[in-house]
Amino acid sequence: MAALTLRGVRELLKRVDLATVPRRHRYKKKWAATEPKFPAVRLALQNFDMTYSVQFGDLWPSIRVSLLSEQKYGALVNNFAAWDHVSAKLEQLSAKDFVNEAISHWELQSEGGQSAAPSPASWACSPNLRCFTFDRGDISRFPPARPGSLGVMEYYLMDAASLLPVLALGLQPGDIVLDLCAAPGGKTLALLQTGCCRNLAANDLSPSRIARLQKILHSYVPEEIRDGNQVRVTSWDGRKWGELEGDTYDRVLVDVPCTTDRHSLHEEENNIFKRSRKKERQILPVLQVQLLAAGLLATKPGGHVVYSTCSLSHLQNEYVVQGAIELLANQYSIQVQVEDLTHFRRVFMDTFCFFSSCQVGELVIPNLMANFGPMYFCKMRRLT
């Protein structure tokens, strides 16, 4: 019976006239109309292969395969939730608080006279900053964050290397702080976790990105802090901040728009390597210099600025720092000093892989055993 049924189906298919199928039900996907001929992710990889193979030499194949592999994350504990309970839950997953573990280890070394680097108090953002990661080589993933008993999310998943610029900023209690390019909001949230900001200005030019920032603040920060005088969210042109609020801030974070190297290899949406964004990409270093210069102008004499990107490119990293310092010296007679952050390599070497040949600043490079980054950061002090 089954054989007869199968034979009947075959005979029926032979008799079906496909021409009788209504045109609206027939569709042949036109590849050229639906997919770009040269996807932006492929253009990004071609660009990186040409430039980074020269910049990094024998290191590039390792960095390349890591960039193309799954990224590793850290869980930033929300101190506005029941942080001790949250920390205990993360410890049960065999994750470790890499910030406080590194600080404790560094303090023991300093007390034993094994290190000549600055004490943790001189560079650590705050002992209240807690971020959990899995050990090197452990590719476990954190479960999605959920609202806790206090009504805010318990932790924020982020590239743990993104916390290093905040740590490098060295916040002190009562600081007036500016996050010049704040969206989507991970570093802004980290700044608030320190408990050191008397006032925090969080700015971004893009309305859509500001909406993402507001969403994070609403999910993680209590209403009385979010809507009070402590946090101010603006959508101004960051390049003009030196004119708007010059000589105002104790600490400024300048996390500039960049080629977002890892994102550019995985996502077509909002990819800066799209052919239509070629000019925008070419002038990125100019924009970055302008933003860093504005951040330095907004800082009080004696204050500190940290410049950061999530790009490997020295054109967007060291060259921008040097260009902004020269610009301020020549046009404003303002002297800026780059601060040494080499101790960050030793303090956090168990968690991150650092590139050892930066001219100024520090660079976390992706590595299969510790697949964070890329993250470049450089600390400066405005002298005059």
UniProtKB/Swiss-Prot annotation:
Residues annotated as transit peptide in the record: 1-25
Organism classification: Eukaryota, Metazoa, Chordata, Craniata, Vertebrata
Keyword Methyltransferase: yes
EC number(s) from the headed UniProt entry: 2.1.1.-
Gene3D superfamilies named among the record's database cross-references: 6.20.240.40, Vaccinia Virus protein VP39
Phenotype upon changing C310W: Abolished methyltransferase activity
Protein name: 5-cytosine rRNA methyltransferase NSUN4
Chemical reaction(s) catalysed: a cytidine in rRNA + S-adenosyl-L-methionine = a 5-methylcytidine in rRNA + S-adenosyl-L-homocysteine + H(+); a cytidine in mRNA + S-adenosyl-L-methionine = a 5-methylcytidine in mRNA + S-adenosyl-L-homocysteine + H(+)
Phenotype upon changing C258W: Abolished methyltransferase activity
A Pfam family per the record: Methyltr_RsmB-F
GO cellular component terms, A-Z: mitochondrial large ribosomal subunit; mitochondrial matrix; mitochondrion
Chain positions with Phosphoserine modification: S206
Impact when changing R141A: Disrupts complex with MTERFD2
Recorded coiled-coil stretches: none
Effect of V65R: Disrupts complex with MTERFD2
Binding site for S-adenosyl-L-methionine: G185, G186, K187, D204, R209, D237, G238, D255
Gene behind this protein: NSUN4
Organism of derivation: Homo sapiens
Assigned keywords, A-Z: Methyltransferase, Mitochondrion, Phosphoprotein, Ribosome biogenesis, RNA-binding, rRNA processing, rRNA-binding, S-adenosyl-L-methionine, Transferase, Transit peptide
Similarity-based family: Belongs to the class I-like SAM-binding methyltransferase superfamily. RsmB/NOP family.
One of the record's GO molecular function terms: rRNA (cytosine-C5-)-methyltransferase activity
Listed InterPro entries: MeTrfase_RsmB-F_NOP2_cat (IPR049560), MeTrfase_RsmB-F_NOP2_dom (IPR001678), RCMT (IPR023267), SAM-dependent_MTases_sf (IPR029063)
Phenotypic consequence of I139R: Disrupts complex with MTERFD2
Known partners and oligomeric status: Heterodimer with MTERFD2/MTERF4; this interaction seems to be required for NSUN4 recruitment to the mitochondrial large ribosomal subunit.
Protein purpose: Mitochondrial RNA cytosine C(5)-methyltransferase that methylates cytosine to 5-methylcytosine (m5C) in various RNAs, such as rRNAs, mRNAs and some long non-coding RNAs (lncRNAs). Involved in mitochondrial ribosome small subunit (SSU) maturation by catalyzing methylation of mitochondrial 12S rRNA; the function is independent of MTERFD2/MTERF4 and assembled mitochondrial ribosome large subunit (LSU). Targeted to LSU by MTERFD2/MTERF4 and probably is involved in a final step in ribosome biogenesis to ensure that SSU and LSU are assembled.
PROSITE patterns hit by this protein: SAM_MT_RSMB_NOP
Keyword Transmembrane helix belongs to the record: no
Subcellular location: Mitochondrion
GO process terms (BP): mitochondrial RNA catabolic process; mitochondrial RNA modification; rRNA methylation
